[in-house]
Amino acid sequence: MKKPFNVLAIIGKPRDQQAIQTHKEIYHWLRSLGYTVFIDDRLREILTDLPTEHFASLIELGKKADLAIVVGGDGNMLGAARVLSRFDISVIGVNRGNLGFLTDLNPEDFQQRLQEVLDGHYLQETRFLLEAEIHRHGQVKSHNAALNEAVLHPGKIAHMIEFEVYIDDNFAFSQRSDGLIVSTPTGSTAYSLSGGGPILSPSLNAITLVPMFPHTLSCRPLVVGGNQRIKLVVSPENRGTQEVSCDGQVSLPVSPGDEIHIYQSPNVLKLIHPQDYSYYHVLRTKLGWSSKLF
Protein backbone atom coordinates (compact mmCIF):
# COMPACT_ATOMS: atom_id res chain seq x y z
CA MET A 1 0.00 0.00 0.00
CA LYS A 2 1.36 3.39 -1.02
CA LYS A 3 2.03 5.79 1.83
CA PRO A 4 0.05 9.06 1.66
CA PHE A 5 3.11 10.96 2.95
CA ASN A 6 6.78 10.26 2.30
CA VAL A 7 8.69 13.43 3.15
CA LEU A 8 7.82 15.12 6.43
CA ALA A 9 8.65 18.53 7.89
CA ILE A 10 8.71 19.58 11.56
CA ILE A 11 7.91 23.27 12.03
CA GLY A 12 7.64 25.63 14.97
CA LYS A 13 9.62 27.99 17.12
CA PRO A 14 9.60 26.52 20.66
CA ARG A 15 9.13 28.80 23.66
CA ASP A 16 10.28 26.39 26.36
CA GLN A 17 12.26 23.23 27.03
CA GLN A 18 9.17 21.01 26.85
CA ALA A 19 8.45 22.16 23.31
CA ILE A 20 12.07 21.57 22.32
CA GLN A 21 11.81 18.04 23.68
CA THR A 22 8.64 17.46 21.65
CA HIS A 23 10.47 18.49 18.46
CA LYS A 24 13.25 16.02 19.24
CA GLU A 25 10.86 13.17 20.06
CA ILE A 26 8.89 13.63 16.85
CA TYR A 27 12.06 13.83 14.75
CA HIS A 28 13.66 10.67 16.16
CA TRP A 29 10.38 8.74 16.08
CA LEU A 30 9.73 9.61 12.42
CA ARG A 31 13.30 8.73 11.48
CA SER A 32 12.92 5.36 13.24
CA LEU A 33 9.94 4.69 10.96
CA GLY A 34 12.10 5.32 7.91
CA TYR A 35 10.72 8.69 6.83
CA THR A 36 12.73 11.48 5.29
CA VAL A 37 12.43 14.34 7.80
CA PHE A 38 13.34 18.01 7.48
CA ILE A 39 13.24 20.59 10.26
CA ASP A 40 12.39 24.28 10.41
CA ASP A 41 15.57 26.29 9.91
CA ARG A 42 14.71 28.49 12.90
CA LEU A 43 15.52 25.49 15.13
CA ARG A 44 19.07 25.09 13.83
CA GLU A 45 20.68 26.86 16.80
CA ILE A 46 18.43 25.07 19.31
CA LEU A 47 18.60 21.47 18.05
CA THR A 48 22.37 21.46 17.61
CA ASP A 49 22.66 17.68 17.96
CA LEU A 50 20.72 17.02 14.72
CA PRO A 51 22.35 16.85 11.26
CA THR A 52 22.63 20.32 9.69
CA GLU A 53 21.59 19.02 6.26
CA HIS A 54 18.13 18.20 7.67
CA PHE A 55 17.29 21.88 8.29
CA ALA A 56 15.50 24.01 5.71
CA SER A 57 13.58 27.28 5.43
CA LEU A 58 9.78 27.34 5.41
CA ILE A 59 9.76 27.92 1.65
CA GLU A 60 12.12 24.99 1.08
CA LEU A 61 10.00 22.80 3.37
CA GLY A 62 6.92 23.73 1.36
CA LYS A 63 8.65 22.56 -1.81
CA LYS A 64 10.16 19.35 -0.39
CA ALA A 65 7.65 17.89 2.07
CA ASP A 66 4.25 16.19 1.73
CA LEU A 67 3.19 16.79 5.33
CA ALA A 68 4.18 19.51 7.78
CA ILE A 69 3.87 18.86 11.51
CA VAL A 70 3.57 22.19 13.29
CA VAL A 71 4.55 22.03 16.97
CA GLY A 72 3.29 24.86 19.18
CA GLY A 73 0.15 26.93 19.49
CA ASP A 74 -2.10 28.54 16.92
CA GLY A 75 0.47 31.33 16.49
CA ASN A 76 3.00 28.91 15.05
CA MET A 77 0.31 27.42 12.82
CA LEU A 78 -0.73 30.87 11.53
CA GLY A 79 2.84 31.81 10.68
CA ALA A 80 3.42 28.52 8.86
CA ALA A 81 0.07 28.65 7.06
CA ARG A 82 0.75 31.97 5.36
CA VAL A 83 3.83 30.43 3.71
CA LEU A 84 2.84 26.78 3.25
CA SER A 85 -0.53 27.59 1.65
CA ARG A 86 1.44 28.52 -1.47
CA PHE A 87 2.61 24.90 -1.87
CA ASP A 88 1.11 21.43 -2.31
CA ILE A 89 1.60 20.34 1.29
CA SER A 90 -0.75 19.18 4.06
CA VAL A 91 -0.45 20.44 7.64
CA ILE A 92 -1.24 18.97 11.07
CA GLY A 93 -0.59 20.51 14.49
CA VAL A 94 0.78 19.26 17.82
CA ASN A 95 -0.48 21.58 20.55
CA ARG A 96 2.21 23.18 22.71
CA GLY A 97 0.33 26.46 23.13
CA ASN A 98 -2.80 27.63 24.90
CA LEU A 99 -6.22 27.07 23.29
CA GLY A 100 -5.02 25.32 20.15
CA PHE A 101 -8.03 25.54 17.82
CA LEU A 102 -5.80 24.52 14.90
CA THR A 103 -3.46 22.07 16.64
CA ASP A 104 -5.22 18.76 17.31
CA LEU A 105 -2.58 16.39 18.63
CA ASN A 106 -1.62 16.09 22.29
CA PRO A 107 2.20 16.11 22.76
CA GLU A 108 1.95 13.44 25.48
CA ASP A 109 0.45 10.80 23.16
CA PHE A 110 1.09 12.05 19.63
CA GLN A 111 2.58 8.78 18.36
CA GLN A 112 -0.62 6.73 18.06
CA ARG A 113 -2.65 9.55 16.50
CA LEU A 114 0.12 10.57 14.12
CA GLN A 115 0.70 6.94 13.14
CA GLU A 116 -2.96 6.70 12.11
CA VAL A 117 -2.54 9.80 9.95
CA LEU A 118 0.63 8.44 8.36
CA ASP A 119 -1.25 5.20 7.61
CA GLY A 120 -3.87 7.19 5.69
CA HIS A 121 -6.60 7.36 8.34
CA TYR A 122 -7.37 11.06 8.61
CA LEU A 123 -9.74 13.86 7.63
CA GLN A 124 -8.62 16.69 5.40
CA GLU A 125 -10.25 20.07 4.96
CA THR A 126 -9.25 23.26 3.21
CA ARG A 127 -9.21 26.63 4.96
CA PHE A 128 -9.12 29.76 2.83
CA LEU A 129 -6.90 32.74 3.53
CA LEU A 130 -7.39 36.45 2.95
CA GLU A 131 -5.14 38.71 0.91
CA ALA A 132 -4.72 42.27 2.18
CA GLU A 133 -3.31 44.97 -0.11
CA ILE A 134 -2.53 48.61 0.69
CA HIS A 135 -3.19 50.86 -2.32
CA ARG A 136 -1.73 54.36 -2.47
CA HIS A 137 -2.18 56.66 -5.48
CA GLY A 138 -3.31 53.68 -7.58
CA GLN A 139 -0.34 51.45 -6.72
CA VAL A 140 -0.01 48.46 -4.38
CA LYS A 141 2.44 49.57 -1.68
CA SER A 142 2.39 46.40 0.45
CA HIS A 143 0.47 43.17 0.86
CA ASN A 144 0.30 39.99 2.90
CA ALA A 145 -1.96 37.02 3.65
CA ALA A 146 -3.97 36.11 6.74
CA LEU A 147 -5.49 32.80 7.81
CA ASN A 148 -7.44 34.32 10.72
CA GLU A 149 -8.02 38.00 10.10
CA ALA A 150 -6.86 41.28 8.63
CA VAL A 151 -7.42 44.15 11.07
CA LEU A 152 -7.42 47.88 10.39
CA HIS A 153 -6.41 49.65 13.61
CA PRO A 154 -4.83 52.94 14.76
CA GLY A 155 -1.36 51.53 15.38
CA LYS A 156 0.62 52.13 18.57
CA ILE A 157 -1.58 54.90 20.00
CA ALA A 158 -5.29 54.16 20.47
CA HIS A 159 -7.53 56.73 18.81
CA MET A 160 -10.63 56.81 16.64
CA ILE A 161 -10.23 56.52 12.88
CA GLU A 162 -12.64 57.24 10.04
CA PHE A 163 -13.09 55.06 6.98
CA GLU A 164 -15.62 53.92 4.40
CA VAL A 165 -16.47 50.30 3.59
CA TYR A 166 -17.26 49.08 0.07
CA ILE A 167 -18.40 45.56 -0.87
CA ASP A 168 -17.71 44.72 -4.53
CA ASP A 169 -17.30 48.47 -5.12
CA ASN A 170 -20.76 49.17 -3.68
CA PHE A 171 -20.74 51.60 -0.77
CA ALA A 172 -21.86 49.78 2.40
CA PHE A 173 -21.25 52.17 5.31
CA SER A 174 -18.89 54.72 6.80
CA GLN A 175 -17.57 54.39 10.30
CA ARG A 176 -15.80 56.17 13.12
CA SER A 177 -14.30 53.50 15.37
CA ASP A 178 -11.09 51.99 16.70
CA GLY A 179 -10.90 49.86 13.56
CA LEU A 180 -12.39 46.88 11.75
CA ILE A 181 -11.73 43.14 11.96
CA VAL A 182 -12.13 41.30 8.63
CA SER A 183 -12.17 37.61 9.49
CA THR A 184 -12.28 34.20 7.83
CA PRO A 185 -14.34 31.34 9.32
CA THR A 186 -11.07 30.03 10.77
CA GLY A 187 -10.52 33.37 12.50
CA SER A 188 -14.08 33.57 13.79
CA THR A 189 -12.96 31.91 17.06
CA ALA A 190 -10.03 34.31 17.48
CA TYR A 191 -9.87 38.13 17.64
CA SER A 192 -13.22 38.42 15.88
CA LEU A 193 -14.90 36.44 18.66
CA SER A 194 -13.42 38.76 21.29
CA GLY A 195 -14.90 41.69 19.37
CA GLY A 196 -18.41 40.20 19.43
CA GLY A 197 -18.32 38.54 16.02
CA PRO A 198 -20.19 35.32 15.18
CA ILE A 199 -18.63 31.86 15.13
CA LEU A 200 -18.69 30.51 11.57
CA SER A 201 -18.39 26.87 10.59
CA PRO A 202 -15.02 26.45 8.81
CA SER A 203 -16.78 25.02 5.75
CA LEU A 204 -18.65 28.29 5.11
CA ASN A 205 -17.49 30.46 2.23
CA ALA A 206 -18.00 33.70 4.12
CA ILE A 207 -16.16 36.68 5.56
CA THR A 208 -17.13 38.66 8.66
CA LEU A 209 -16.66 42.38 9.25
CA VAL A 210 -16.56 43.16 12.97
CA PRO A 211 -16.37 46.82 14.08
CA MET A 212 -14.02 47.66 16.95
CA PHE A 213 -15.69 50.02 19.44
CA PRO A 214 -17.77 51.94 16.87
CA HIS A 215 -18.97 55.43 17.79
CA THR A 216 -22.61 54.47 17.23
CA LEU A 217 -25.22 52.24 18.85
CA SER A 218 -26.50 50.77 15.59
CA CYS A 219 -23.36 49.15 14.17
CA ARG A 220 -23.29 45.34 14.15
CA PRO A 221 -21.03 42.64 12.67
CA LEU A 222 -21.70 41.92 9.00
CA VAL A 223 -21.28 38.60 7.18
CA VAL A 224 -20.62 38.74 3.42
CA GLY A 225 -19.89 36.15 0.77
CA GLY A 226 -16.41 34.70 0.71
CA ASN A 227 -15.91 35.67 -2.94
CA GLN A 228 -16.78 39.31 -2.41
CA ARG A 229 -14.06 41.96 -2.41
CA ILE A 230 -13.89 44.37 0.50
CA LYS A 231 -12.44 47.85 0.13
CA LEU A 232 -11.74 50.16 3.05
CA VAL A 233 -11.09 53.79 2.16
CA VAL A 234 -9.27 55.56 4.97
CA SER A 235 -10.29 59.19 5.44
CA PRO A 236 -7.59 61.71 4.46
CA GLU A 237 -8.58 63.59 7.62
CA ASN A 238 -7.21 60.86 9.89
CA ARG A 239 -4.12 61.81 11.86
CA GLY A 240 -0.94 59.81 11.98
CA THR A 241 -0.35 56.39 10.48
CA GLN A 242 -2.73 53.48 10.82
CA GLU A 243 -1.92 49.80 10.31
CA VAL A 244 -3.39 46.62 8.88
CA SER A 245 -2.40 43.63 10.99
CA CYS A 246 -2.43 40.15 9.41
CA ASP A 247 -3.01 37.42 12.01
CA GLY A 248 -1.47 39.72 14.62
CA GLN A 249 1.97 38.86 13.22
CA VAL A 250 2.56 41.09 10.19
CA SER A 251 1.82 44.83 10.08
CA LEU A 252 1.23 46.87 6.92
CA PRO A 253 1.48 50.67 7.38
CA VAL A 254 -1.54 52.69 6.22
CA SER A 255 -1.54 56.43 5.55
CA PRO A 256 -4.58 58.75 5.49
CA GLY A 257 -6.26 58.46 2.09
CA ASP A 258 -5.04 54.90 1.41
CA GLU A 259 -7.31 52.10 0.24
CA ILE A 260 -7.20 48.62 1.78
CA HIS A 261 -8.33 45.82 -0.52
CA ILE A 262 -9.19 42.52 1.17
CA TYR A 263 -10.26 39.45 -0.75
CA GLN A 264 -10.10 35.66 -0.69
CA SER A 265 -6.68 34.29 -1.54
CA PRO A 266 -6.35 31.78 -4.39
CA ASN A 267 -4.25 29.67 -1.99
CA VAL A 268 -5.73 27.39 0.67
CA LEU A 269 -4.36 25.63 3.72
CA LYS A 270 -4.79 21.85 3.56
CA LEU A 271 -5.42 21.00 7.20
CA ILE A 272 -5.20 17.40 8.42
CA HIS A 273 -7.17 16.07 11.42
CA PRO A 274 -7.41 12.68 13.17
CA GLN A 275 -10.28 10.61 11.84
CA ASP A 276 -12.48 11.21 14.91
CA TYR A 277 -12.11 15.02 14.71
CA SER A 278 -15.25 17.08 15.39
CA TYR A 279 -15.24 20.87 15.08
CA TYR A 280 -18.09 21.14 17.58
CA HIS A 281 -16.22 19.02 20.11
CA VAL A 282 -13.33 21.48 19.75
CA LEU A 283 -15.70 24.40 20.39
CA ARG A 284 -17.14 22.71 23.49
CA THR A 285 -13.77 21.93 25.03
CA LYS A 286 -11.92 25.12 24.10
CA LEU A 287 -14.74 27.55 24.92
CA GLY A 288 -16.07 25.70 27.97
CA TRP A 289 -19.53 25.00 26.60
CA SER A 290 -21.84 22.72 28.58
CA SER A 291 -21.89 18.99 27.95
CA LYS A 292 -24.96 17.04 26.87
CA LEU A 293 -27.75 16.96 29.45
CA PHE A 294 -29.28 13.63 28.41
From Swiss-Prot:
Active-site residues? D74 (proton acceptor)
GO molecular function terms attached to this record: ATP binding; metal ion binding; NAD binding; NAD+ kinase activity
Cofactor(s) needed = a divalent metal cation
Positions annotated to bind NAD(+): D74, G75, N148, E149, H159, R176, D178, T189, A190, Y191, S192, L193, S194, Q249
Q: Which domain of life is it from?
A: Bacteria
Enzyme class, broadest EC rank? transferase
Where would you say this protein principally sits, based on its record? cytoplasm
Q: What is its EC number?
A: 2.7.1.23
Query: According to its record, what are the GO cellular component terms?
Result: cytoplasm
The cellular location(s) given in this protein's UniProt record come to: Cytoplasm
- Catalyzed chemical reaction(s): NAD(+) + ATP = ADP + NADP(+) + H(+)
Q: Which UniProt keywords apply?
A: ATP-binding, Cytoplasm, Kinase, NAD, NADP, Nucleotide-binding, Transferase
List GO BP terms, alphabetically. Answer: NAD metabolic process; NADP biosynthetic process
- Record keywords: Acetylation included? no
Q: What does this protein do?
A: Involved in the regulation of the intracellular balance of NAD and NADP, and is a key enzyme in the biosynthesis of NADP. Catalyzes specifically the phosphorylation on 2'-hydroxyl of the adenosine moiety of NAD to yield NADP.
Which HAMAP family does the record cross-reference, listed alphabetically?
NAD_kinase (MF_00361)
Which family does this protein fall into? Belongs to the NAD kinase family.
Q: What is this protein called?
A: NAD kinase
